[in-house]
Every structure is written in structure tokens, then in C-alpha cells.
């Protein structure tokens, strides 16, 4: 069943006296429970595509449906409600609040959603335990490894039970062992029914996923539907991990 449908999407940015087509006639369907990636070099349009899919922006033309709702011309308030109820985000830089502990970082989206304190606490604890960080619930981000911070970010992304999670270069700041742990966690989430879309420029990550959408010059270049290897090690080149990071993914 289609969760996301894009039909002839165009996104034009006006820069001075020029019109720049970031997306040029993109059509795409993503089904519920899919685990896929959007891959492409800088300037390919992949980030713009993620912004539209994540209801952070609207297209210049074309139609975009999320869970059957047309958001092509949605207002900022309508987009915000869609993000809060159906979409989760995981970022390369984690985007955690450094002065809040794990529990309160994960609770934050529910504060904006108006969820009661009791329900917030119950859902946050469940999400934290789902990513195996129950023993770190009262630590702040500065007391965690990079891999642990990313798992906190994932818990925060799933705490409102979204239909779809977008992950922007989620292993970009992690060593390969920790990156493998994060990729496995995403796969488990997809198997539970949550659609996972990873945005990356890394072919090694893309080759691990069941489907890849390759962007080039604002268009979809290749859609690979065939299953890829799910057992080969995740070979990624990342910065040297911080002390303790590899031992505590």
C-alpha cells in the first residue's frame, strides 16, 4: 500500500534573476514498511527531495500525498501537524539538547504535540528501551558515545509512532562498527512496519538496502528494486571515533 506518492514534482528556487530547478519532474511511490535509501552527490536534489517528503517544504508544482493526504499546497501549520503525527527525523549531527538528559530529549516531540506528562513519560521510556538505552536514561548527551547519541535520536524520532522516519546521513559521524549497529536498528524498525528512508551519498550503505533511489541533476536516475545483500559488513569511511565510542555503539 502506498504511503507516499509524488507525481511530477518540481521545486524551483529563485536565485537573483535565475530559476534553479532543484527537482525536475520527480515521480515516486514509497510503500508502507519499506526500507530504502535516496542517494546522490551534492547538488543532486536528494536533500530537497527529503525536505518535501518530510513536509519541511512544498513543491512548486506537482502533487505530493502522505498517507493519502495531499500536502502539495499545505500551510505551514498543516505541514507542522503532519510532521508531528506521521513523520520522524534522524540527523547526522543528532540535534540533541545538551543540557537535557536522554529521557527529556526523547519526550520533547510529545511536549510540542500536547501529550500529557504521564503519557509522555511512558512512551519515552518505551522508546528508549526499544533502542537498548534504558541504562542511560538519565545521562546527558555529553556523557554518551556517538552511537548512543544516535540511538537517542532514533528513540526521539519514533516516540510518536510515526508512519515514516527520514534519516539524513545517520552513520556519517560514526565508526563502521557503530554504523552497522544503527543500520541493524533501522532494519528492525522497518520490519515492525515503520517506513525508513535513509538519505546518503555513501554507496556502501546504499548497497545494503532493499531499494535505492538515485538522484542526479534533480531527477531520479535509477530505481533499484532488487534486494541487496543484507549480511555483508557495513564498510564505511568515517572519522576516528571518540574514546569509548566503538566499545559502546
Language model feature labels by segment:
Residues 1-12, 222-249:
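ABC-family P-loop ATPase nucleotide-binding domain
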Amino acid at each position: 500500500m502506498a504511503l507516499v506518492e509524488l507525481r511530477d514534482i518540481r521545486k524551483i528556487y529563485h536565485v537573483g534573476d535565475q530559476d534553479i530547478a532543484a527537482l525536475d519532474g520527480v515521480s515516486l511511490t514509497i510503500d508502507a514498511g519499506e526500507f530504502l535509501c535516496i542517494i546522490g552527490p551534492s547538488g543532486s536534489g536528494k536533500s530537497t527531495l527529503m525536505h518535501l517528503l518530510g513536509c519541511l517544504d512544498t513543491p512548486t508544482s506537482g502533487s505530493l500525498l502522505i498517507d493519502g493526504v495531499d500536502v502539495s499546497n499545505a500551510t505551514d501549520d498543516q505541514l507542522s501537524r503532519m510532521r508531528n503525527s506521521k513523520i520522524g527525523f534522524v540527523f547526522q549531527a543528532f540535534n540533541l539538547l545538551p543540557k537535557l538528559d536522554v529521557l527529556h530529549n526523547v519526550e520533547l516531540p510529545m511536549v510540542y504535540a500536547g501529550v500529557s506528562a504521564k503519557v509522555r513519560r511512558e512512551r519515552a521510556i518505551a522508546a528508549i528501551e526499544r533502542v537498548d538505552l534504558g541504562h542511560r536514561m538519565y545521562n546527558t548527551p555529553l556523557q554518551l558515545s556517538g552511537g548512543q547519541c544516535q540511538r537517542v535520536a532514533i528513540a526521539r524520532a519514533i516516540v510518536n509512532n510515526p508512519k515514516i522516519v527520514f534519516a539524513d546521513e545517520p552513520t556519517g559521524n560514526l565508526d563502521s562498527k557503530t554504523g552497522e549497529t544503527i543500520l541493524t536498528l533501522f532494519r528492525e524498525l522497518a520490519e515492525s512496519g515503520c517506513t525508513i528512508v535513509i538519505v546518503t551519498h555513501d554507496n556502501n550503505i546504499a548497497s545494503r538496502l532493499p531499494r535505492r533511489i538515485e538522484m542526479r541533476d534533480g531527477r531520479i536516475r535509477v530505481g533499484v528494486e532488487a534486494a541487496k545483500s543484507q549480511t555483508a559488513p557495513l564498510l564505511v569511511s568515517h572519522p576516528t571515533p571518540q574514546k569509548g565510542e566503538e566499545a559502546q555503539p
